[in-house]
A protein has these predicted regions:
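Sec/Tat signal peptide C-region and signal peptidase I cleavage site
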Residues: 5-9
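Periplasmic alpha-helical coiled-coil/stalk elements that build and connect Gram-negative outer-membrane
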Residues: 11, 17, 136-252, 351-354, ...
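Acidic, low-complexity, intrinsically disordered peripheral segments
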Residues: 11-12, 66-68, 406-443
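Small/polar-residue-enriched beta-strand and adjacent coil segments characteristic
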Residues: 15-18, 57-136, 259-340, 351
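N-terminal targeting signals for Sec/Tat export/insertion, comprising classic cleavable signal peptides
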Residues: 16-53
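Amphipathic alpha-helical coiled-coil scaffold segments and their short linker/junction regions
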Residues: 20-27, 78-89, 185, 224-288, ...
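Amphipathic alpha-helical coiled-coil segments
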Residues: 35-50, 137, 141-163, 171, ...
């Protein structure tokens, strides 16, 4: 139980990674990011497919026909003569044949009422949405990495503190047993030491379990079954962060969620264009050529060119209501975009304030640790001289551990708040740079 944290990590065979290397591994191996990449590629292909809209469409059609055709030919003034020869009026001809009809048809849209433009705009907006979602997924994965990576660091710090507290209370219990045998203290004081030591042992066991859980989380996130040993320590920047307004401005211009909502708004606008096109006529040029004229029907032309105009007079669906529905979708997207901007500004302000508060707590706890360490030393000396009770030593030992844990927690709170601030302002890819320039780290 008293083995050091570094020895424990080495025994597990875990791989040592600094934060930048861990981030690189995450971006390479995350299945969620692979899925978002595939979505972007899908939308890129879809947008590419719409670029050819408006070009001529050429169809080849081959028909195998088994047909029968009956023709009637009126004889007119020749009817009396024909009747003398037993010929009925009108003459009837019946033809039954099997024929092959190879036909090529070309169609060129000349005017679609905005359908093609709306379809292209919608495809581009879907691509923009996919790219925003891809970036958002990457940013959320980075934030999750910060929580897991530095969460394991916090668990290691807590384990080290619980180990030291347990060792200190072991020493105190040994002293109490000696003093009890020499009848310098009562059994009640020795029992106080025993109870405190047992509590510390349970806290240590819980810290071991917490560290194992944190390691499992980070190992799973980085697809490293052998485990990961973080080597970039918890840190706190001694100087204040940039102004809150700078982070807000960055968030409103670069946050992936706002980009996603802008893309949705563009899709809604494209939907309005498409619905309006259904109220307008369409004009197209066309041409058709028959490659086998010998077997063609009497009504089939050899070739045809022309212009067609098509306008739907009545529809089973209310076209005006469809346009209005599309407009309301635009309003919905616009309102959602404004609301998201407000919520992101609130989130940025909270994260900025949390980071500054954690930084202040961390710096103030420096002097608290020195005071707690000196108090513990004096209480131990006073106890040996019978100037302090067992409870005084226990309180001093626990107080020292509490302050150390609070300092590690303050560093973790700072790192997490900073990561949330950077994620909200679209800058979380700079997290490794912030860690590199920190000069206040947890050992």
């Amino acid at each position: 139980m008293l083995a050091s944290v570094s020895a424990w990590a080495q025994e597990t065979g875990s791989i040592a990674l600094d934060y930048r290397a861990a981030e690189h591994r995450l971006l390479e191996r995350s299945d969620a990011l692979a899925a978002s990449d595939a979505n972007v590629q899908s939308k890129e292909a879809q947008a590419g497919a719409t670029r050819s809209l408006g070009r001529p469409e050429v169809d080849f059609e081959a028909q195998l026909l088994d047909y029968q055709k009956t023709l009637y030919l009126p004889l007119g003034s020749l009817a009396p003569v024909a009747e003398a020869f037993g010929i009925r009026d009108p003459l009837r001809f019946r033809r039954r044949e099997t024929a092959v009809r190879p036909i090529v048809t070309a169609t060129l849209p000349l005017y679609t009422g905005g359908l093609i433009a709306g379809t292209k705009a919608g495809a581009r907006a879907q691509l923009d949405q996919a790219r925003a979602e891809q970036r958002g997924a990457a940013d959320k994965a980075r934030l999750q990495l910060v929580q897991a990576y530095y969460g394991q660091q916090l668990a290691e710090q807590a384990l080290g503190v619980r180990r030291d507290v347990l060792a200190g209370l072991d020493r105190h219990l040994a002293d109490a047993l000696k003093l009890e045998r020499e009848q310098f203290i009562s059994k009640a004081q020795r029992l106080q030491a025993q109870v405190a030591r047992d509590d510390a042992a349970r806290e240590f066991e819980r810290a071991v379990a917490d560290l194992a859980t944190a390691n499992a989380v980070l190992a799973g996130l980085l697809r490293a079954p052998e485990g990961v040993r973080p080597i970039t320590p918890l840190f706190v920047l001694p100087q204040r962060l940039e102004s809150l307004e700078n982070y807000k401005a960055a968030a409103l211009s670069a946050h992936p969620e706002l980009e996603r909502l802008r893309a949705l708004e563009a899709q809604a606008q494209a939907g309005v264009t498409i619905e309006r096109s259904k109220q307008r006529p369409t004009v197209a040029g066309f041409g058709q050529y028959n490659f086998d004229r010998r077997d063609s029907l009497l009504t089939d032309p050899d070739w045809t060119v022309g212009i067609s105009l098509r306008y739907k007079i009545a529809s089973g669906m209310g076209r005006n209501q469809a346009v209005e529905a599309a407009r309301q979708t635009v309003r919905q997207a616009d309102a959602g975009l404004r609301e998201a901007g407000v919520q992101i500004e609130i989130g940025v302000a909270k994260a900025w304030n949390d980071a500054e508060a954690a930084r202040s707590r961390f710096l103030l706890l420096d002097s608290a640790i020195e005071s707690a360490r000196e108090n513990l030393r004096l209480q131990r000396l006073s106890y040996r001289e019978q100037q302090a009770t067992s409870l005084d030593v226990i309180d001093a030992e626990l107080g020292m551990g509490r302050v150390r844990v609070q300092r590690a927690q303050a560093a973790y709170d700072y790192v997490l708040a900073l990561a949330q601030l950077l994620e909200l302002s679209g800058q979380i890819e700079q997290m490794a740079d912030y860690a590199a320039r920190a000069d206040r780290v947890m050992p």
